[in-house]
Regions:
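A beta-strand signature from Gram-negative outer-membrane beta-barrel systems
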Residues: 89, 192-231
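Extracytoplasmic beta-strand/coil segments of soluble accessory domains associated
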Residues: 136-177
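Membrane-embedded beta-barrel scaffold of Gram-negative outer-membrane proteins
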Residues: 549-553, 580-640, 661, 667
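Face-selective signature of the C-terminal outer-membrane beta-barrel domain
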Residues: 309-329, 351-518, 523-525, 529-545, ...
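Short acidic/polar hinge/loop motifs at secondary-structure boundaries
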Residues: 55, 176-203
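C-terminal beta-signal and adjacent terminal beta-strands/loops
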Residues: 556, 614-615, 713-743, 748-794
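Short, acidic, small-residue-rich periplasmic hinge/interaction motif at the N-terminus
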Residues: 25, 34-36, 67-71, 81-129
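Gram-negative outer-membrane beta-barrel transporters
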Residues: 504, 603, 607-612, 630-726
C-alpha cells in the first residue's frame, strides 16, 4: 500500500479528502470493491477504473474497511489530521486472503458466479446509472439477450434469450419471481440507480433460483447500501418524458440498525411518430387507403413507486434481518391492439401494487457450516381496465365517421376491444423462498431449496350481467418447487461441479360462466401438474486465464398465470388446455483472459448452446380483425447457436465491448396427428429475431478542466437482422417480415471534482430509423434526453 499526500489551502484545512485506487496484481482495475469509513459511516464502491473518492471529510484519524466479494475484508488506518491521503491497494487474482502486507486476493463477484459453470452474463448498471438509460436498454446490450417491447417507455416488455422468449425466460428480483411485485414495479420502471447488477442465466438455472424455467432466467439484484447516503436524479427528454429517482439511507455504526428508502417516478406522453404499411387512414366515401406519418395520440404512461427496507445487519443472531415494503402504481393509455392496424382512442388501464416482505439470513446457525436464508412476501395487486367508448379512431387521432357524419363503432354498446368493460382484477400473491446450506467440507457443500407461491385472482366487472358475475369464481394457482444441490471443488479449485435435482408441482382451479342455451352455467376447471428435472454445471480452469464451462439440464416450465387465465388489460384470452414446456438444454463455453499487454487488456467469452424443446408455449397469431390473442403449444422446436463477447480496455481510458449472437430455432415436428406434414416444418420460429450484434465504445477524460473531474463520451451500435413475422412458408414475398434494423446512440457525461454532481446527455436512434418489435409494433425514433444526478451523501 502506498500513500501519496498533498496539502490543502488554509481555507480547506478542516476538511480533507481520501482518494484511492484498487487494482489487481496484473494491473486490471478492481471494480465494485467496497470502501467504508467506519467513524463517519460513509462508504463508496470503486468505479470501473478501480478508483474511489471521499470528499469533505473532517480532519481526524479513521479506520477504512475494504471488502471484496467472498472475503472477510481488511482494515486500514488512515491519518487525515493534517493532510489528505491517496491509497493504492493491490489485489491478487484468486480467492485467498492475505492481511500481513495489506494485500487482499479476490475475484469480482461476476467472475465468481461465472466460474461455477453456469452460462451467465453480468450487466453492471451502476457505472451507467448517471446516463439516461433504461434498465431494459442496459440488459439489451448483453450477448444473447434481445429485449422485446411493443412501444416506448412503459410498454409491454419480454425477453428473448438464445431463441426462447416470453415466460420461457423467468425474471426475478433478488431471487423472487417478478410477478410477485406487480407490473408497476418491473424492469421497465425500476431505474438503473436502484439496481446493483443484472444476472442473466442462459438455459440452465442454479438450484437456489427455485423456479420452473425453460430458457434460463434474469435475476435483478437491487442495490443494498450499508452506510448513510443520499442521492437524487432528474431527467427530461423527448415525448415529454420525465424521470425522477431519490435514494437515501441511514446506518447506525454502533447498533448496525439501517433504513433505506428509494422512490421513482416515470411519466411520458409517448407521442412519437409512426409510419409504414400499418399506419393509414381510409376515406369513408371512396374506401381508398392513404398512408400517413402520424403521432401516437393515446399512449401516455405514468408509474411511481417507493421501496423501504428497515432492519439490522451483522448482529449476533442474524447476518441480515429486514422488513420491506414496496408500494407502486401505474396508469397507461392503450394506443393499439395486438397489431398496429387496430387503433384505440379511449381504452386505458390502471394498476396498483403493495408488497410486504421479510428477509432473514444467517451463517453458522445452530452449528458451524450450516447457513439459512429465507424470504417471504405478501402482495396485493389491483388491475383495472376501462373500455366503455365504442368509437373507431384513425391514426390522425380523429373519430372515423360514416357518410352521414355519425361515429363508426367497433360494435354496438361495446368498447374498443370488444364488449364494454370496467373489469377489475384483485390479485393476491404469497411467496416464500428458503435455502438451507451445509458445508460438509471445504470442498463439498449440500443445499436444500424450497419455493412456495400461492396466487389468487378475483374478477369482477360491473358492466357484465349479474348472473354471470355471480358465477365467476376466484382463480387459484399454487406452485411448489423443491430442489437439492451438491457443490464440490477439486485440484485446488480448478475443477468445480454443481449437481441439482428439482421437483415441480402446480395446482390450478377456477370456475367460469358459460352460456348453455338460454342459461348461464358455471364450468369448473381443475388441473394438477407434477414433474421433475435435473442438471449439472461444471467449470475447469485449464490455465489461470482459460476456463472451460459446461452445463446441462432437463428443464421444465409450467403454464403461467396470464397464459392460462388470460389478462384483459393486455388483450390476452385464457387458454386452459396448455401443456407444460419441456426442454433438454446444453451449454459449452470458455472464459478467456484477462490478457494484458502493456496498457491493453482483453477478455473473451463464448458460449455454444442446444435447446431441444417440446410443447413450447408461444403467442398465437393476431390478425388485423382480431383484438385479442391466446397462447398455444408448438409440438417440437430445436434451437442451436452461439454467443461471442469481446471486451477491450486501453489504459483505463478507452473501453470497447462488442458481442454477436446467432441462433437457429426451427419447428421440428414433421407430421400432425393425422399424418399430414406441417407446411412450416423446419421453418424458423415466427416473430423471433435470430441474429443480433451490439458494440459499446466509451472514452474517458480524467481531470477534465478541473482536477478529479471526469468526462466520458460513449457510442452504442445495435444490429438486428431481418426476421419473419409469421412462418417463412406462409409469408408473402416482400411482406410479413420485420426488416433489418440498425440503431446508433450517442452520449456524453460529466462528473464534477467532488463526485457529487453529474450531468449527462443522450441521443438515441440518431438516424431516426424505423424500429419494430413484437409483431411489427413500431418503437420510438430519434430522441434526446438530459439527466442531472446529485449525491450530497455517498
Amino acid at each position: 500500500m502506498s500513500f501519496n499526500c498533498y496539502s490543502k489551502t488554509p481555507k480547506e484545512a478542516s476538511l480533507k479528502s481520501l482518494t484511492g485506487k484498487v487494482v489487481y496484481k496484473n494491473g486490471a482495475p478492481a471494480e465494485l470493491a467496497l470502501v467504508y469509513i467506519k467513524q463517519i459511516s460513509k462508504n463508496t464502491y470503486t468505479d470501473e477504473n478501480g478508483n474511489f473518492i471521499f470528499s469533505d471529510i473532517p480532519a481526524g484519524k479513521y479506520t477504512v474497511f475494504i471488502k471484496a466479494y467472498e472475503t472477510n475484508g481488511i482494515t486500514v488506518e488512515v491519518d487525515l489530521t493534517k493532510k489528505s491521503d491517496h491509497l493504492t491497494i493491490v489485489l491478487e487474482n484468486n480467492e485467498s486472503t492475505t492481511l500481513d502486507n495489506v494485500t487482499i486476493t479476490s475475484k469480482s463477484k461476476g467472475k465468481v458466479i461465472k466460474e461455477k459453470g453456469f452460462s451467465v452474463a453480468i450487466a453492471n448498471t451502476q457505472k451507467l446509472a448517471i446516463q439516461n438509460l433504461q434498465s431494459t436498454e442496459i440488459l439489451g446490450r448483453t450477448a444473447g439477450v434481445k429485449i422485446r417491447q411493443s412501444g416506448g417507455l412503459g410498454s409491454h416488455t419480454h425477453f428473448n434469450l438464445n431463441g426462447l422468449s416470453g415466460n420461457s425466460v423467468r425474471v426475478f428480483i433478488d431471487g423472487i419471481p417478478i410477478r410477485n411485485y406487480g407490473e408497476s414495479f418491473s424492469l421497465s420502471s425500476i431505474p438503473p440507480a436502484m439496481i446493483e447488477r443484472i444476472e442473466t442465466y442462459k438455459g440452465v438455472l442454479p438450484a437456489e433460483l427455485t423456479e420452473d424455467a425453460l430458457g434460463g432466467g434474469i435475476n435483478i439484484i437491487l442495490k443494498k447500501s450499508i452506510d448513510t447516503h443520499l442521492s437524487a436524479s432528474y431527467s427530461y427528454g423527448s415525448f415529454n418524458t420525465h424521470q425522477v429517482n431519490i435514494d437515501g439511507g441511514y446506518r447506525n455504526p454502533i447498533t448496525n440498525f439501517n433504513i433505506d428508502v428509494s422512490t421513482f417516478l416515470n411519466s411520458t406522453d409517448n407521442n412519437y411518430e409512426v409510419w409504414g404499411d400499418n399506419v393509414y387512414v381510409i376515406n369513408p366515401n371512396t374506401g381508398k387507403i392513404k398512408y400517413v406519418r402520424a403521432e401516437r395520440f393515446h399512449d401516455k404512461y405514468k408509474s411511481k413507486g417507493i421501496k423501504t427496507n428497515i432492519g439490522y445487519t451483522s448482529i449476533k443472531w442474524a447476518d441480515e434481518i429486514t422488513l420491506g415494503l414496496i408500494i407502486s402504481d401505474m396508469e397507461n393509455d392503450i394506443q393499439t391492439g395486438p397489431v398496429m392496424d387496430i387503433v384505440y382512442g379511449n381504452r386505458k388501464s390502471k394498476r396498483t401494487s403493495k408488497m410486504l416482505s421479510f428477509k432473514y439470513r444467517k451463517k453458522d446457525i445452530v452449528i458451524d457450516g450450516l447457513s439459512l436464508n429465507t424470504f417471504t412476501s405478501f402482495s396485493h395487486t389491483n388491475r383495472t381496465v376501462i373500455d366503455t367508448v365504442p368509437y373507431m379512431y384513425s391514426w390522425l387521432g380523429k373519430i372515423i365517421r360514416d357518410n352521414n357524419g355519425d361515429p363508426v363503432n367497433w360494435q354496438s354498446n361495446g368498447g374498443e376491444a370488444g364488449d364494454a368493460t370496467l373489469a377489475e382484477n384483485k390479485e393476491i400473491n404469497i411467496a416464500n423462498r428458503t435455502g438451507l446450506y451445509y458445508q460438509l467440507h471445504p470442498q463439498h457443500k449440500i443445499g436444500l431449496h424450497y419455493f412456495y407461491n400461492r396466487f389468487t385472482r378475483d374478477i369482477d366487472d360491473p358492466l357484465r350481467p349479474q348472473a354471470e358475475r355471480d358465477l365467476t369464481d376466484t382463480r387459484y394457482l399454487t406452485k411448489q418447487i423443491i430442489s437439492y444441490s451438491y457443490e464440490s471443488n477439486f485440484f485446488t479449485k480448478k475443477l468445480k461441479t454443481n449437481l441439482f435435482y428439482k421437483q415441480y408441482k402446480q395446482d390450478v382451479k377456477l370456475s367460469d360462466p358459460k352460456k348453455a342455451g338460454q342459461e348461464i352455467v358455471a364450468t369448473t376447471y381443475k388441473k394438477d401438474i407434477s414433474h421433475n428435472g435435473y442438471g449439472a454445471a461444471i467449470s475447469f480452469a485449464i490455465t489461470p486465464k482459460i476456463t472451460l464451462l459446461t452445463s446441462a439440464e432437463k428443464a421444465l416450465r409450467m403454464p403461467g398465470i396470464s397464459e392460462l387465465l388470460g389478462n384483459t388489460s393486455d388483450n390476452i384470452q385464457p387458454t386452459y388446455t396448455l401443456l407444460p414446456e419441456t426442454s433438454t438444454n446444453f451449454n459449452l463455453g470458455f472464459l478467456l483472459g484477462t490478457y494484458t499487454t502493456k496498457k491493453h487488456h482483453f477478455n473473451i467469452e463464448t458460449n455454444f448452446f442446444i435447446r431441444d424443446i417440446k410443447n413450447l408455449i408461444t403467442r398465437g397469431i393476431s390478425g388485423s380483425i382480431s383484438d385479442t390473442y391466446g397462447f398455444e403449444n408448438l409440438g417440437k422446436v430445436k434451437s442451436t447457436g452461439y454467443d461471442l463477447e469481446l471486451k477491450y480496455n486501453y489504459n483505463n481510458r478507452l473501453f470497447i465491448t462488442s458481442n454477436f449472437s446467432n441462433f437457429n430455432a426451427r419447428y421440428n415436428l414433421r407430421y400432425d396427428e393425422f399424418g399430414s406434414e406441417y407446411i412450416y416444418y423446419k421453418d424458423r420460429l415466427r416473430n423471433a429475431p435470430y441474429l443480433t450484434a451490439n458494440t459499446y465504445v466509451e472514452y474517458k477524460f480524467n481531470d477534465f478542466i478541473k482536477k478529479n473531474s471526469k468526462l466520458s463520451i460513449n457510442y452504442n451500435f445495435g444490429y438486428t437482422h431481418q426476421f419473419y413475422r409469421n412462418w417463412e412458408s406462409l409469408a408473402s414475398k416482400g411482406k410479413a417480415y420485420i426488416p433489418t434494423q440498425t440503431l446508433h446512440d450517442l452520449g456524453i457525461s460529466y462528473t464534477a471534482p467532488n463526485n457529487k454532481t453529474s450531468l449527462s446527455f443522450n441521443a438515441k436512434n440518431i438516424t431516426d430509423k424505423q424500429v419494430f418489435d413484437n409483431w411489427a409494433m413500431q418503437k420510438p425514433g430519434r430522441s434526446f434526453y438530459l439527466k442531472l444526478t446529485y449525491r450530497p451523501l455517498f
